[in-house]
Amino acid sequence: DTVWSIDYLNCIKEMENFYFSKKIQNILMVVNKDLSFDKKLKGDFNLKKNLLSKGDENQSIYTGCQILNKNLLKNINKKIFSINEIWNALVKKNNLFGFESVNKFSHVTDLEIYNKLLKSY
């Protein structure tokens, strides 16, 4: 889980403004993996001009913050599904948007990282 701080507030507001001003259907907040406290975390996406893609060497980590238009969910006929299904379909259409945070990224990946995070705060 992501450790959220007040530092993210402006970034979330900027992401929200981008979402509405560009009239897009989705946006995910990502951070460059170099800003991750846990250096073992691998990237989820690549970000270029606010578009997300996937490759062999992904440089951006999904933070856990996203805005999705409910219309993206209307064709899902399962009670339980992975949001990755929607993301992957949008990536294939070159239509998954990203917003880059420049905040340091702390994610409680496991007990070891949790204990290291405790010592750093």
Locations of the language-model features?
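Catalytic-core segments of class I nucleotidyltransferases/pyrophosphorylases
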Residues: 3-9, 13-16, 20-21, 33-37, ...
